[in-house]
């Protein structure tokens, strides 16, 4: 069967990496453009932090927009977003990456990122890909640092997302990925992986046609 490849831009790229973390046996390659390796709290508890998901300008007003979520900073709520919830969502966790490496050293990671990304995520992305390589992952980060690297077709700017389209990303890298996997057969299998987070253990596993999360 064909390899399973996940990819995306910004948050989509983050989700692709997250799938590789919680279900490494279900993916062979990750394609990313400009994802943050760390959870962005404004998308989870932004209203309580006074940080909107986005801001829109309406004449003389800056209007902050928020996602409606169950998460809260209230320590007495069952929906309190704790450090454990943060850790399991973080890609940049050395302890978790060591566990992931036991299941996914053959997974191919390819990422593009601007060194001048306005969200300040470039250093974290460099650290993540350095850890990937140190742990034996097949990982390549294209860190765009200079305007000379802008071809105005594939990479158009040094801002977040590089002016790059998802279709452009796949057109650029998919032939390379398929060539790397040429002659290999991939079979679907069920698996299970557990990550310690503080006093909790998050276990992700296949069970029949379902993919389950158990927290103990």
Residue ranges and their predicted role:
Residues 18-80:
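Hydrolase active-site cap/lid region
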Residues 102-109:
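Short, proline-enriched alpha-helix->beta-strand connector loops that line the catalytic pocket
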């Amino acid at each position: 069967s064909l390899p399973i490849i996940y990819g995306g831009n910004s948050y989509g790229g983050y989700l692709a990496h997250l799938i590789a973390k919680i279900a490494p046996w279900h993916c062979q390659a990750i394609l990313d453009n400009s994802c943050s390796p760390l959870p962005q709290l404004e998308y989870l508890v932004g209203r309580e932090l006074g940080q909107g998901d986005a801001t829109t300008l309406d004449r003389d007003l800056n209007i902050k927009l928020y996602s409606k979520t169950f998460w809260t900073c209230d320590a007495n709520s069952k929906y309190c977003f704790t450090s454990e919830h943060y850790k399991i969502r973080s890609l940049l966790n050395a302890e978790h990456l060591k566990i992931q490496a036991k299941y996914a050293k053959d997974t191919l990671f390819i990422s593009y990122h601007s060194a001048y990304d306005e969200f300040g995520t470039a250093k974290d992305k460099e650290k993540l890909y350095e850890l990937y390589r140190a742990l034996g992952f097949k990982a390549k980060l294209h860190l765009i640092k200079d305007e000379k690297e802008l071809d105005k077709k594939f990479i158009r700017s040094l801002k977040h997302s590089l002016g790059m389209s998802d279709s452009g990303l796949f057109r650029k890298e998919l032939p390379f990925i398929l060539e790397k996997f040429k002659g290999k057969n991939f079979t679907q299998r069920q698996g299970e992986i557990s990550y310690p987070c503080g006093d909790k253990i998050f276990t992700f596993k296949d069970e029949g046609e379902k993919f389950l999360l158990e927290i103990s």
